[in-house]
Amino acid sequence: MEGEQDIGVEFLGDYKILCYLRKGLWCQDILAEHRFIKKRYILKLLCSELSSSEAFMTAFHEAIIKLATIRHPGIISIENVSQAEGQYFLVTEEKEVPTLSLAQYLSSCSQGLSELEAKDLICQLAEILDYAHANRLIHGGLSLDSVHIDLTGQSPKVFLPELGFSFLLKDQYTQSLLRDSSEKSSFDKLKQILLFQAPETALGTVAEDVYAFGVIVYFLLFRQLPQGAFPLPSEAFPEYVYDWDRLIQSCLSYAVEKRPKKLAPLLVKKTLGEQFLAAKIQCSEEDLREIEEEPQVPSVANILQKVEDKIIEETSDHLEFVLVEAKSIDEAMNTSVDSKEEVVAEDESYSNALQSLLIREPVVSRYVEEEKEEVKPQPLFTEMVFIEGGKFLRGSREGQRDEHPVHEIFLHSFFLDIHPVTNEQFVRYLECSGSEQDKYYNELIRLKDSRIQRRSGKLVIEPGYAKHPVVGVTWYGASGYASWVGKRLPTEAEWEIASCGGVTQLRYPCGEEIDKSQANFFSSDTTPVMSYPANPYGLYDMAGNVYEWCEDWYGYDFYEISAQESHAPQGPAQGVYRVLRGGCWKSLKDDLRCAHRHRNNPGAVNSTYGFRCAKGVK
């Protein structure tokens, strides 16, 4: 990567620092590798000046919670948030943020952008902002410098690296520019901030993003910012087919309530009438002429009459042959001798009938394609076990701190799948959805970390793995599958009580001890479901094979809260991580305990993560 600075061996928490990357306004980017799982990430180390501000950290924490729950190719993807030696840092995927701002990209395009090129960038930006606003995220600092362009693919892709943080950093950014006020570039940037700022007081609202979006659209079309009584695109570019006037006027409206809530629907073409008028305006008066005489359009009957005359003329030499061939087979087999008058009369009547057939106007009916009902894949259901509700003990005295204290809870009755969802079950869900992402662009499964592959556009399971539990699936994929089959994910409390099999404070699902004949752990791969004995409830693979996603957000101290509010606990109201339970095929024995808690980001992908479904009793 460009700009990397080699350094010696150095650690930041659990991450081995490989090299330093670019330094931004609010963070230092670092390429690092996790010391245990040996996977590379980009760490964003917060500046000490910001991390020491309590007001900033409070707002920053709220933004992180929102960002951690979403996945979009145009928004920074956060895997984790951590702290080491008093330093806060974000853990993001190994993808360096593009360093080419929109201003730099436009300056590199000597010929300017065509309408379609500008429309493509505008459409991407509108779609990202609509997605962010739907998830209660505001940019608050849109400008030519905050919008980045990724040129690594076949076509330019819009990326917003500061989405969620920009509004928090606006004051600091302005102060840094004022410190460098002697430079002309700093003055230009300050001017740009003011021109992209909505006229109302800055509060970090959707309306402010919409206003800045309108300014960006105007700049992409005109290569200048809208100031004063600015001209509209229809005046300068009458040949453009999209209705840019409506978009710009609605976005730049001084009345906040008149600005649109969604941006993507504004990208519409002009009507055919508007396009015709625009084309007419372009034409000079010399090119316009009035049609004084009404053109003589031949009627359909005249055309058919001419065609008929031509056919009769061309076939007159062969008419006798045609008439003989066209007669019925009964007449051809008739060997009786008729009088000459009868033959002539019959031939004349037959000729007249043929001519009337030729001059008949053809009837053309509209072709309507027969609708074929698309047959979508149906789910393969798993047998379920009924678990009667009541009072139970959960937690552990010997485990980690987040398993304390042991406390009593009450659960309603519920059903639980007897084994985790398999590859052959999950592949039907993917075929039905038609994508590896949901409608919010959340990843459902990462195929390269699973045993399901896409070959020639078709999903196939690796040979021998149809009955193995599906892996590489995110929490979103697990939750989506459960909804598809009319079920849900189990709560953490339901999962723990089910793993104990109705026995109070059972250490492992199979008893007080466990060995490799009772569960798949500390091994090299998954095994087919139901390969090991079931627990007392008749549930298989509650220990080992794959970690299983639960419905709950993870809370480190939630057991203390659950001890006070013990009625059907369902986890914290919000959080950064989702709960995982049960250990996996490469876990140590301690991870297989019924009370052991694990967690990860809901969008995290791992070859050890799977799930099973639950259902309430109505």
From Swiss-Prot:
Gene3D superfamilies: paralog of FGE (formylglycine-generating enzyme) (3.90.1580.10), Phosphorylase Kinase, domain 1 (3.30.200.20), Transferase(Phosphotransferase) domain 1 (1.10.510.10). InterPro entries: CTDL_fold, Kinase-like_dom_sf, Prot_kinase_dom, Sulfatase_Mod_Factor_Kinase, SUMF_dom, SUMF_sf. ATP binds at residues 21-29, 44. It catalyses: L-seryl-[protein] + ATP = O-phospho-L-seryl-[protein] + ADP + H(+); L-threonyl-[protein] + ATP = O-phospho-L-threonyl-[protein] + ADP + H(+). Keywords: ATP-binding, Kinase, Nucleotide-binding, Phosphoprotein, Serine/threonine-protein kinase, Transferase. Pfam families: FGE-sulfatase (PF03781), Pkinase (PF00069). Autophosphorylated on serine and threonine residues. PROSITE patterns: PROTEIN_KINASE_DOM. Its EC number is 2.7.11.1. Residues 15-381 form the Protein kinase domain. One of its GO terms (molecular function) is ATP binding. Together with the serine/threonine kinase PknD, may play a role in the specific interactions with host proteins during intracellular growth. Belongs to the protein kinase superfamily. Ser/Thr protein kinase family. This is Serine/threonine-protein kinase pkn1. It comes from Chlamydia caviae (strain ATCC VR-813 / DSM 19441 / 03DC25 / GPIC).
